[in-house]
Each structure stands twice: as structure tokens, then as C-alpha cells.
């Protein structure tokens, strides 16, 4: 029996080989103890402030919503050390690993952002680091691969399956099942077996807490909606967590529609998948008629995931959060618009959330609304991808 609730409604759980159950129980207990230990909280918050650069800014866009009555703020997780929201929870889990007496860290990464965040935390805290990464992602994210290596991490390309994030996840779990006595598996999103979805949410929830305080100070009221992209869902749950009880605030998650929801090239399991067991949890999953996991697709490597965190599945099921999808082309347009109109280059992941917010503003230009987009990461890692696409289209 788990000590914390392992399920969100019908979703979640702990579907892992028996050999991993003691490791997950140990992790759950360490997390419970750490949450009650003021010294742990103080060390974690200290690292976030002095090393990572929290709190991050809440920036009012000046030009993007001209011609509409929408006020659009960006929560600037792109300004965090490491370039994305990933740094928050990685520091928390790395401290937990040290607390459990483990000196090795295993991680998986898609876009490379979680890998970079894990590598920097391991360098800072003196932990050995090995990162599993789909061979395809190693190719399309070479700057991040080099960053990880610079900080002392070993990057292990995974060639099995589609050679993307889901395969890296499987290899990382396989490694951990043989090494958990000395190694901690530092999972990169709010998904996977319990207690990971809960741990990652709690180590990301400062995003929404800060946003709430900042918007109240600036506007004197809560936003009408907070909007975040959803792959596994950690940046979104970090933004949503502190607003779930605020019923006037719409929670909007944006999945990748890829080349179109009506094609087989998208990554939107929440709205277009079926419930299944994957990566140690029960959650919506992209699967074929035989129940085999289908490949997800997105121009953004960090959203290219065939499932989604169980709390998002639950929030969707009870109608508390709403989930929509944005295509590659719409995300690319938003990416370029933000760069040109505000001088901010967003991650392709975050561009999906931004594109949705721009639709909300432009579809109803006379509506006075206050929106916050979680700008979960910066776009340095994506400039080569975007350059190649625009070149192919003859757009540059």
C-alpha cells in the first residue's frame, strides 16, 4: 500500500515490475519526510533562488495582442538557469537522491532540456549522471547533447523502437531496475509510476504560486485563464496546481496536433487516445486497434510523447481543465511572432501554448480578458529546426 494516494480518479497507479516496488516505496517515504523537513525546504528554495534565478518574471506583452482587448502575460520560465522549467524539479529530486544516500542519477530526455537540467544539478551536487536519449533526438538536439557532456553527463543513445522519448523512458526504467540501490531515476515529467507524478507536481508548483502572487500584485485580480503546453505535463501541472481551487480561472492545456489531428502524426493522447497502461501508469495513450503503443509526433521533441500525466487525465475527465491542440504550423507562426514582436524566442513546446492564447485573443478581439501563458522554455535549442523548416518553405 502506498502512503500517499497513488491515483487521480481512475488514472495513475504503480504498474511496475515487483523488483522496483521497494525503490518506489523508499522514494515515497523520502519525499514525505523531506516535505516535512524545514531544512530540506530551505535548501531547495535556496538553490532555486541563488542558483536557478527564481522567482521568474511575469512579463506583459506589449505588441502581440494589439487590436484586441486581451492582456497577455508570459510566465518567464525561459529565464531560469538551464533554459526551461525543468530545472525546478530536477534540483528537488537531486536533493532527494542525496538524502537517500544515492550517488548516481539516471534520466531520460526528449528535447534534451531535462537532460541538461539533470546534468547541471548533478554537476552542482556532485552526483554521477547518465542520460538515455532516443537516437533521433540525439540528432535533432545536438546542442543539448554537447551541453550535457560538457557538464560531465554520459549520454546513451537509444536505437530501439522509434528511437524517441518513449524508448528512452523504457531504457531508463530498465537500467533503474538493476541499479536502484545506488542510483535514483530522476524522471523528467509529471507522469510514470507513483509517486513521480505527485513529486514532480510539488517540485514545480512554485510556477503557479509565483504567477498568482505576481498577477494579483500587477492586476489586482486572478487571470481569466492560464495556458500551458502538455507533453507529459509537468510545466502545465506546475502552473495549474495553485489555481485548481480557483474556480473562476480556466486551466487550458495544449497538446501537439502535429501535422493534424486527422492524420496519424500528432501527440494528443488526452483528447484522441484510449486509456491504457504505459510507463508504469494508467493513463490516456496513443494506441492502435491491437492496443500497441502508437508513435506520437510533434515538431517539438519535448511534446513528442504518446501518453500524458495522470492528473491531467483526471482534470480533463472531471471537466476542471480543458485541453486543446495546436498544429506544427500554428506553433511555428507563434514562435516567429513572439520573436518579432516582443524580442523573445520561445521553445517550440511553449509556442503551442502561445498559439492557443493568440487564437483566444484574435477570435474575440472585443472581449476583455486577462491571460497568462506559461513560457516554459527558451528557443535556443530549436533555432536550427525552425531554420530548416522555414528554408524548406522558402520563407527565409
UniProtKB/Swiss-Prot annotation:
Q: Which cofactor does it need?
A: pyridoxal 5'-phosphate
Entry-linked InterPro entries: Trp_synth_b_CS, Trp_synth_beta, Trp_synth_beta/beta-like, TrpB-like_PALP, TrpB-like_PALP_sf
Q: What PROSITE patterns does this protein's entry cite?
A: TRP_SYNTHASE_BETA
The pathway entry for this protein reads as: Amino-acid biosynthesis; L-tryptophan biosynthesis; L-tryptophan from chorismate: step 5/5
Q: What's its EC?
A: 4.2.1.20
What is this protein for, i.e. what is its function?
A: The beta subunit is responsible for the synthesis of L-tryptophan from indole and L-serine.
Q: What is this protein called?
A: Tryptophan synthase beta chain
* Organism from which the protein derives: Vibrio vulnificus (strain YJ016)
Amino acid at each position: 500500500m502506498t502512503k500517499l494516494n497513488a491515483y487521480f480518479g481512475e488514472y495513475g497507479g504503480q504498474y511496475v515490475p515487483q523488483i522496483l516496488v521497494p525503490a518506489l516505496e523508499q522514494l515515497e517515504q523520502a519525499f514525505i519526510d523531506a516535505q516535512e523537513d524545514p531544512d530540506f525546504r530551505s535548501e531547495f528554495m535556496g538553490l532555486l533562488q541563488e542558483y536557478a534565478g527564481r522567482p521568474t518574471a511575469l512579463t506583459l506583452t506589449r505588441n502581440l495582442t494589439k487590436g484586441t482587448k486581451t492582456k497577455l502575460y508570459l510566465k518567464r520560465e525561459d529565464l531560469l538557469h538551464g533554459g526551461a522549467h525543468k530545472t525546478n524539479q530536477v534540483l528537488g529530486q537531486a536533493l532527494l537522491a542525496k538524502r537517500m544516500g544515492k550517488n548516481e542519477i539516471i534520466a531520460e530526455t526528449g528535447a534534451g532540456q531535462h537532460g541538461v537540467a539533470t546534468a547541471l544539478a548533478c554537476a552542482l551536487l556532485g552526483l554521477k549522471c547518465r542520460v538515455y536519449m532516443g537516437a533521433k533526438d540525439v540528432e535533432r538536439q545536438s546542442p543539448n547533447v554537447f551541453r550535457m557532456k560538457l557538464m560531465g553527463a554520459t549520454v546513451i543513445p537509444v536505437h530501439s523502437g522509434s528511437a524517441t522519448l518513449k524508448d528512452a523512458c523504457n531504457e531508463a526504467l530498465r537500467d533503474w531496475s538493476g541499479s536502484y540501490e545506488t542510483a535514483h531515476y530522476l524522471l523528467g515529467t509529471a507522469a510514470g509510476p507513483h509517486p513521480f507524478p505527485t513529486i514532480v507536481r510539488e517540485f514545480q508548483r512554485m510556477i503557479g504560486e509565483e504567477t498568482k502572487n505576481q498577477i494579483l500584485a500587477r492586476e489586482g485580480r486572478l487571470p481569466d485563464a492560464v495556458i500551458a503546453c502538455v507533453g507529459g505535463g509537468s510545466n502545465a501541472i506546475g502552473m495549474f496546481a495553485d489555481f485548481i481551487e480557483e474556480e473562476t480561472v480556466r486551466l487550458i492545456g495544449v497538446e501537439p496536433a502535429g501535422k493534424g489531428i486527422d492524420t496519424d502524426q500528432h501527440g494528443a493522447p488526452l483528447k484522441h487516445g484510449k486509456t491504457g497502461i504505459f510507463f508504469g501508469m494508467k493513463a490516456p495513450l496513443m494506441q492502435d486497434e491491437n492496443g500497441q503503443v502508437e508513435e506520437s509526433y510533434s515538431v517539438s521533441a519535448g511534446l513528442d510523447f504518446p501518453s500524458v500525466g495522470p492528473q491531467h487525465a483526471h482534470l480533463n475527465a472531471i471537466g476542471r481543465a480543458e485541453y486543446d491542440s495546436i498544429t506544427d504550423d500554428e506553433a511555428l507562426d507563434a514562435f516567429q511572432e513572439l520573436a518579432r514582436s516582443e524580442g523573445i524566442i520561445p521553445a517550440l513546446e511553449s509556442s503551442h501554448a502561445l498559439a492557443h492564447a493568440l487564437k483566444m485573443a484574435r477570435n474575440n478581439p472585443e472581449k476583455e480578458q486577462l491571460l497568462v501563458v506559461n513560457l516554459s522554455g527558451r528557443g535556443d535549442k530549436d533555432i536550427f529546426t525552425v531554420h530548416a523548416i522555414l528554408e524548406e518553405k522558402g520563407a527565409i
